Regions:
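Conserved SAM/SAH-binding loop-helix junction
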Residues: 25
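Long, charge-dense tracts
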Residues: 225-229, 245-430
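Class I SAM-dependent methyltransferase "Motif I" SAM/SAH-binding loop
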Residues: 20-21
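Short, flexible hinge/linker loops that cap or flank conserved catalytic cores
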Residues: 10, 305, 488-489
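Long, contiguous domain-sized segments
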Residues: 28, 32-160, 371, 385-392, ...
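Conserved beta-strand elements of the Class I
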Residues: 15-17, 310-314, 494-496
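RNA-binding accessory domains that recognize and position tRNA/RNA substrates
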Residues: 1-14
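Extended, Lys/Arg-rich, non-catalytic nucleic-acid recognition/anchoring regions
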Residues: 5, 28, 32-305, 334-338
Length: 722
């Protein structure tokens, strides 16, 4: 097992660096720009620098500017040179290495960018044509005493980006915000372009294409579909290391050597662990055991069927095409046959008649395995006269509301609406896009859950493979469990999930909260609020603790799956106070869960043909940080979708000063997270995020689009978002 990082050693321990002072005389915007692209050294904390450079003895603070082009046109009042021993301070040494790496690539005309966690993102030209340039991005990050003794360089292939060859000033229709530009060798948001950038470049900065401006510049966004993520990522990182990093020029200009050549770091055996085999087992409707819902759910049905039958009805547009798709979908779900019973209006001419004949032949040739009832192990009830049609997108909400207010619906019955829509979930038209959310909200206000099906998917020859996904989601929405975990972690744990979602065009992020009350993955309550609305979150947590105690007794542990790395001190105190008010004394653990991305440090298994580790593997990265792999590979070199691992940071949530966690506690928590990853019922395809985070994130994604920006009461006890 290796990680995408290579060991380096410094050739020059002592280096001469430029440091600056006197930025207080600059404008506020210049001060902010300078501070953002420098590290600050101060008296008291960083006395080693004052001891090495007597010239700065009268300064209280100095700055080392390691992103130099970003501060072009900004000149602090004072400039000093100091001899710096790289062994004296890791923080400054890392900045010096970063500066040297950025200089090396920019000297070779490669744009560089600091990403949101401080890594160097290098943009390498991949393709050029008359109108655009495509870049392949790579990230580089120096670390000290992480995966080896001493220094290492993490190297990863990132995403692609496309840049227009036409400068911004020549495209009058471009907005003032919402995209980044290449400015010299920098990547800068357009809204942060200042006069100093115009002066330095003569106004020649070029827009980076994103979905918001793609139509304006007439260039498609970059999209590279990868079917072999792990092997291709490792190969790309190796090629980049060989061609650009492990070279004489890099060694000389950055001042490093590679003691192990161009080899990535091998992980010691004690860092690589595996969850117990029994933790991988799932259970289905006939109590059959298995590990892969994609292969097994269709044959064995749900672990827990919905207790009460639901009545189904359709919502579609009022036109012939929609009626045609409605009848087709009804027959697919009810009889596993894709035909329409001649539901079209009469043909208008011979050409139309011939077209419909061919279309019927194509439809009838489609294979559908079995009706939805055989997946659900429960026959759906279709009640005549319940289906609703609407005239247009503009009148849809009013017409559906009027229909729901009719006497056809009864409060003692449970309903599920099947919405057939021609609006894709990524539709760029804002009004059409919002209709999707408003329909969901309206139905919940009347206590009705819903399943949305994109009309064009019904035409797909692979629609047969959509049906198990629809069935799994319906089971969850109707209160059942599509599958469960066979072997549960012992103990009476209360598990809380808090996820966040920040979306383009919505200023403040929203939190979604899910309170899981048993280890099978059953939820009792959802909610969503703005990220700064801590009162609502605290109130929900307190109610949930009391409900948990009433149903299951006092918890042995409170485990919070959280979108942040750790609780603030005041957040810990508030939770501890709540537990005391409920007369509960139990440990609190916080698990930060993040999906590893292309650019992260991840582990590769060289014994697997595609380099992806087996499901259940977890890697101890550092401190309390781990990588956890959940996929469908259960045998060496078995076929499976390539899913990136999740990064876990496990910390003590109490203010008791105890940070060391017991090995067995860590193992139980990681096993629990692994099992929650395997209970995702939105699809039969395995996911790599636990439902304690994935479901709250879905809730937080929907709520900002609702008319009242709050979750209807019905939606707090129902998996409506699947």
């Amino acid at each position: 097992m290796i990680v995408n990082s290579t060991k380096i050693e410094l050739t020059n321990e002592v280096r001469v660096i430029d440091i600056f002072a006197g930025i207080g005389g600059l404008s506020v915007s210049y001060q902010n720009a300078y501070k953002k692209n420098s590290i600050r050294m101060s008296v008291g904390r960083d006395d080693f620098l004052w001891n090495q450079c007597s010239e700065i003895e009268k300064e209280d603070e100095v700055f080392f500017n390691y992103w130099e082009e970003e501060t072009i046109g900004i000149t602090p009042e004072k400039n000093y040179q100091a001899e710096f021993d790289m062994s004296k301070n890791v923080r400054l040494a890392k900045a010096v290495l970063t500066q040297s790496i950025v200089r090396y690539f920019r000297k070779r005309n490669c744009p560089c960018h600091r990403d949101f966690i401080g890594r160097v993102e290098v943009w390498m030209k991949a393709q050029e044509d008359d109108v655009s340039t495509s870049y392949q991005k790579f990230t580089i990050q120096p670390r000290f005493n992480d995966q080896c003794d001493g220094w290492q360089l993490d190297i990863a292939e990132g995403r692609n980006s496309v840049v227009s060859m036409t400068p911004v000033k020549d495209i009058a229709e471009l907005p003032q915000d919402g995209y980044d530009v290449i400015c010299n060798h920098c990547v800068i948001p357009i809204k942060r372009i200042e006069q100093r950038h115009w002066t330095a470049t003569n106004g020649l900065f070029y827009p980076i294409v994103n979905p918001g401006i793609s139509g304006t510049v007439g260039i498609k966004c970059s999209h590279k579909r990868e079917t072999d993520k792990f092997a291709s990522k490792l190969a790309a990182a190796q090629t980049f290391l060989d061609s650009w990093i492990c070279t004489d020029d890099f060694k000389r200009e950055v001042g490093v050597i590679f003691p192990n050549g161009n080899q990535f770091i091998s992980l010691p055996a004690d860092k690589v662990m595996m969850v117990d085999e029994e933790a991988k087992e799932l259970v289905y409707g006939d109590r059959t055991d298995g590990k892969s819902p994609r292969l097994e759910f269709r044959n064995h049905g749900p672990y827990k069927r919905p207790e009460t039958p639901f009545t189904y009805f359709f919502i579609t547009k009022d036109d012939d095409t929609s009626k045609f798709y409605r009848m087709r979908l009804f027959n697919i779900l009810q009889y596993a046959k894709d035909y329409c019973y001649g539901n079209w209006s009469k043909p208008v001419d011979e050409k139309d008649k011939e077209f419909r004949k061919k279309e019927d032949a194509r439809i009838n040739a489609k294979t559908i395995d079995k009706p939805i009832a055989e997946y659900l192990l429960q026959r759906p009830i279709w009640e005549g006269g319940l289906s609703c049609t609407y005239t247009s997108d503009q009148t849809a909400i009013a017409e559906i509301r009027k229909h729901l207010q009719s006497s056809r619906f009864h409060t003692d019955q449970k309903y599920i609406a099947i919405i057939i829509t021609d609006i894709h979930r990524d539709d760029q038209n804002k009004e059409r896009h919002e209709l999707y959310y408003l329909m969901k909200e309206l139905l919940m206000q009347y206590g009705i859950t819903s399943q949305v099906i994109y009309r064009n998917n019904i035409d797909s020859t692979s629609f047969n493979w959509f049906i198990p996904n629809i069935a799994a989601a319906l089971v969850g929405k109707m209160g059942g469990m599509a599958w469960g975990v066979k072997s549960l972690v012992k103990g009476n744990d209360m598990i809380v999930g808090i996820g966040a979602c920040k979306q383009r065009g919505i200023k403040k992020p929203y939190l979604g909260s899910a309170f899981c009350f048993d280890k099978e993955g059953s939820f009792r309550n959802f909610n969503s609020c703005r990220a700064d609305d801590t009162e609502t979150l605290q109130s929900d947590l307190k109610k949930s603790i009391l409900n948990f105690c009433e149903d299951y007794g006092k918890p042995d542990r409170l485990i919070i799956h959280y979108y942040k790395k750790k609780l603030k001190r005041e957040e810990s105190e508030q939770i501890e106070n709540m537990l005391r008010q409920c007369d509960i004394d139990c440990p609190i653990y916080v698990v930060n869960v993040v999906t590893a991305s292309n650019e992260d440090l991840i582990a590769f298994d060289l014994y697997q043909f595609d380099k992806m580790p087996m499901s259940g593997t977890y890697i101890h990265l550092r401190g309390t940080e781990y990588l956890l792999y959940n996929n469908e590979r259960y045998t060496p070199n078995g076929k499976a979708d390539k899913l990136y691992p999740i990064k876990l940071t496990i910390s003590n949530g109490s203010n008791n000063g105890i940070n060391n966690l017991d090995y067995q506690v860590v193992r139980e928590i990681i096993t629990q997270v692994y099992q929650f990853c395997r209970l995702y019922w939105k699809s039969v395809k395995m996911q790599n995020v636990p439902i304690t985070i994935a479901y709250p994130e879905l809730v937080a994604k929907y709520v900002p689009h609702f008319s009242y920006e709050e979750l209807p009461e019905f939606g707090r006890k129902n998996l409506w978002m699947l």
